């Protein structure tokens, strides 16, 4: 098998509408059309899809996913101005410039500006 890329990342959220407000309005993703699959939304994040799925219980899954940004300092400033707590970590050669935040449901997200 040779993967062609990542199609989407699925995230369980307790409230799909609140999730949409954060990922679309705060993080700037674009809402996509979605078939009738129950409560949830599909979003575009620069050509990669993020699927929000409303769930009363969050199953075990990935620890975090990373959002690539062109200017991490500008992204951090923008998020902080919107009241989001963002933790920037020291630069690690080979890993790029990184910062971490949590969505309203406690899911961990990484911002990554490649070297």
Question: Where on the chain are the PLM-derived regions?
Answer:
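Short, conserved charged micro-motifs
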Residues: 18-20, 72-76
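Short acidic/glycine-enriched loop/turn segments that link adjacent beta-strands
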Residues: 36-39, 59-61, 93-97
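Core segments of cupin and vicinal oxygen chelate
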Residues: 10-49
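Short, charged/polar, Gly/Pro-enriched secondary-structure boundary elements
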Residues: 48-51, 106-108
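N-terminal beta-strand motif that seeds the catalytic metal site of vicinal oxygen chelate
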Residues: 1-17, 63-65
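Short hydrophobic/aromatic beta-strand micro-patches
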Residues: 12, 66-70, 102
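Structural preference for long, well-ordered alpha-helical segments within the folded cores
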Residues: 21-22, 78, 105
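Vicinal oxygen chelate
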Residues: 1-2, 32, 81-115
């Amino acid at each position: 098998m040779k993967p062609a890329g990542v199609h989407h990342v699925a995230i369980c959220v307790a409230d799909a509408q609140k999730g949409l407000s954060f990922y679309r309005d705060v993080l700037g993703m674009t809402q996509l059309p979605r078939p009738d699959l129950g409560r949830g939304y599909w979003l575009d994040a620069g050509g990669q899809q993020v699927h929000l799925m409303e769930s009363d219980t969050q199953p075990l899954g990935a620890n975090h996913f990373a959002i690539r940004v062109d200017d991490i300092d500008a992204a951090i400033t923008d998020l902080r101005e919107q009241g989001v707590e963002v933790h920037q970590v020291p630069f690690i050669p080979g890993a790029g410039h990184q910062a971490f935040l949590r969505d309203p449901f406690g899911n961990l997200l990484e911002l990554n500006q490649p070297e």
